[in-house]
């Protein structure tokens, strides 16, 4: 694992967590955060990016062959899932798991919220440094 990349990720994850706290985005107790450097093919579209496991309160980010910004965007997406699990834990108990989104309206709702909020959180966070 590239120590510089890991150090940078850890730094920015800490900064994002501070930001979440500042804006009142509820994620505590924090999940265990795992940076997984399992090799990902460089030119493969369908690689694993990350996941949140509510039963273990664990968030895994796959970091090999990925830009730091992309990894942090995944982190924000998965932290929205953490927030969803805090605000409405039954949501996860009732979700359709690994079904295709076209067949899983509850999962589609959960994922839609995570994509929308996760990207907005990350954009607003980055704007603190660019505007």
Residue ranges and their predicted role:
Residues 2-58, 120, 124:
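Auxiliary, metal-adjacent structural segments of Zn-dependent hydrolase domains
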Residues 2-6, 65, 104:
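Active-site oxyanion-binding pockets that recognize sulfate/phosphate
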Residues 26, 89-90, 128-129:
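Short, polar/charged, Gly/Pro-enriched helix-capping and turn/loop motifs at alpha-helix termini
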Residues 58-75:
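Short pre-active-site segment immediately N-terminal to the catalytic Zn-binding motif
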Residues 69-73, 85-116:
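Post-HEXXH active-site segment of zinc metalloproteases
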Residues 76-84:
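Short active-site segment of divalent metal-dependent hydrolases/proteases
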Residues 123-131:
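Long, well-structured alpha-helical subdomains associated
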């Amino acid at each position: 694992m590239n120590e510089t990349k890991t150090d940078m990720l850890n730094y920015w994850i800490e900064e994002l967590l501070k930001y979440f706290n500042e804006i009142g985005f509820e994620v505590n107790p924090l999940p265990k955060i795992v940076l997984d450097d399992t090799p990902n093919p460089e030119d493969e579209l369908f690689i694993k990016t990350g996941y949140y496991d509510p039963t273990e309160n664990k968030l895994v980010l796959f970091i090999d062959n990925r830009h730091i910004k992309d990894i942090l965007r995944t982190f924000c997406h998965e932290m929205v899932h953490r927030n969803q699990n805090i605000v409405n834990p039954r949501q996860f108990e009732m979700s359709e798991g690994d079904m295709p989104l076209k067949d899983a309206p509850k999962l589609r709702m959960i994922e839609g919220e995570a994509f929308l909020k996760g990207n907005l959180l990350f954009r607003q966070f980055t704007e603190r440094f660019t505007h």
